[in-house]
Amino acid sequence: MKGLLQRVRSARVEVGTEVVGAIEQGILVLVGIEPQDTRASADKLLHKLLNYRVFSDVEGKMNLSLREVGGGLLLVSQFTLAADTKSGLRAGFSKAAPPALGAELFDYLLSQARIAHPTVAAGQFGADMQVHLINDGPVTFLFDT
């Protein structure tokens, strides 16, 4: 399972004209699910997202986690993170999980996040979404569990 974390001042996801998820300061995470991923992969990714130190302390060092700053978590499914881009000029998606598995694991990740953290929002799995964000830094990390 891949998670592309971006530290944001704010972010929102729209499907059509409807805002389906929004946060203020926090992290936006694009989530790519692969066929070999399991609930254990989701648990490992969630632990990293909530506890990885991406926010600055009073000395300006990235020393604080999402939990410590009380920021929002916005999860957005993105199957293109599992793309094979090594050859040619067109991505291959055979490394992406089938939609049923992807939906199941994304829903699991989201439900566990809502149990573990007070401010969680999400995009809509499988939808054509517009993601708006104000990067903070920018600070971006790629996790691969």
UniProtKB/Swiss-Prot annotation:
GO molecular function, one term: tRNA binding
Subcellular localization, as worded in the UniProt entry: Cytoplasm
Role according to the record: An aminoacyl-tRNA editing enzyme that deacylates mischarged D-aminoacyl-tRNAs. Also deacylates mischarged glycyl-tRNA(Ala), protecting cells against glycine mischarging by AlaRS. Acts via tRNA-based rather than protein-based catalysis; rejects L-amino acids rather than detecting D-amino acids in the active site. By recycling D-aminoacyl-tRNA to D-amino acids and free tRNA molecules, this enzyme counteracts the toxicity associated with the formation of D-aminoacyl-tRNA entities in vivo and helps enforce protein L-homochirality.
Pfam families, A to Z: Tyr_Deacylase (PF02580)
Name of the molecule in the record: D-aminoacyl-tRNA deacylase
Keyword Transcription: no
GO cellular component, one term: cytoplasm
Domain text: A Gly-cisPro motif from one monomer fits into the active site of the other monomer to allow specific chiral rejection of L-amino acids.
Subunit structure: Homodimer.
E.C. number(s) listed in UniProt: 3.1.1.96
Keyword ATP-binding: no
The entry's keywords: Cytoplasm, Hydrolase, RNA-binding, tRNA-binding
Reaction it catalyzes: glycyl-tRNA(Ala) + H2O = tRNA(Ala) + glycine + H(+); a D-aminoacyl-tRNA + H2O = a tRNA + a D-alpha-amino acid + H(+)
InterPro entries from the UniProt entry: Daa-tRNA_deacyls_DTD, DTD-like_sf
Motif Gly-cisPro motif, important for rejection of L-amino acids, chain ranges: 137-138
Homology family: Belongs to the DTD family.
One Gene Ontology biological process: D-amino acid catabolic process
